[in-house]
Amino acid sequence: MKMKKFAALAAATVMSVSAIAATSAFGVFATTDAGVNNIVIKDSDTNRVYKAYQIFDQASATNTIKWGQGINGDALLTKLKTSGLNTYMSQFDSAENAVDVAKIISDADHWTKEDTAKLAKAASSCIIDSKSVTAHEANGEYTINVPSAGYYLVVDATENNGVDKANSALILNVSGTTDVTPKRTKPTLTKQIKHNENEAWGDVGDNAIGDDVEFKITTTIPSDVSAYDKYTYTVRDQLSEGFTFNDNLTYKYYDADGQEITSVTVGPNTTVGDDSSTTDYKESFYVTFDIKELVKNYPTVAKIETYYSAKLNEKAKVAVTAPDSVNNNPNTAYLTYSNNPQDKTGKENGETSKITVYDWTFSLVSNKVEGRASCRC
């Protein structure tokens, strides 16, 4: 059966996390084999692993579509009927072969981002690994030489190992040379402390024992999380022993233009105390946001500000003279987030860098001046 129009579906490219950017590039299925067919991925990260799997093959002589050698077609048919594609799920129920699937997704102009991401995710679970073609890297470009024209699932197979990386899966229509530039938007975290004299937010505070010290944690949200069934997003905060947490967390939400989004009803889950799953870090509290639900209800949300205060207690380190590297009462935070939509264990998470702010606390020194007591701090 001839197919002159076939949607080129680019599935969600994940930016640990996250961030994530899902795009759709619609085009025509190649009607002839260009001879030399390759995928060129422009990526400055030279430590990644990219693989390609042929999903649909089109015989150049007859212009007919069949399953590619990199996919288990029967398994994909079953998966498409159960993967919850919002718009086209009922049509897939009657699909029997590659041609049927091609006909359904050739009208993909009205697919949602979630549909597009789920299609790639379904295909990712049905690949034949022994039939993959692995990219070779040179000068910031990964080249995958594929055997013939057709539709390929390109998978970022890089092992994350808990570092700040992200994985992606995308479907491309390949005829000749097809260029790809991965778009990764990962969440970020910054932390600030309010100075007691000028009310400015910064890296260093200057307070006395007994003061309530204010803190602000700012985190960004990936531009698209549609590839994930669930997206982990947890702010982890560690107070030094000189602080007592006041348990007064509040939140503000903003769009990409910095406009505050008010009346947000999708609240986070907060736990005061340590998380046993982070063995190398002792939390004072951690906050988990349901990013999928938040984005569903507030599609423009791009940033979260988390506010709280803590009291400087009698265990605070005191700098007698000038601030030093020891007596500085540190406060550290970082963010853990999902970075692989193909992960079924929920354990493949990325981490932002740990950000630390300090409060230098000075002692009160009493001096006798002509019968009057004075002090300096």
Predicted regions and their residues:
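Bacterial N-terminal signal peptides
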Residues: 12-18
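Surface-exposed loop/edge segments in extracytoplasmic proteins
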Residues: 200-202, 246, 257-267, 343-344
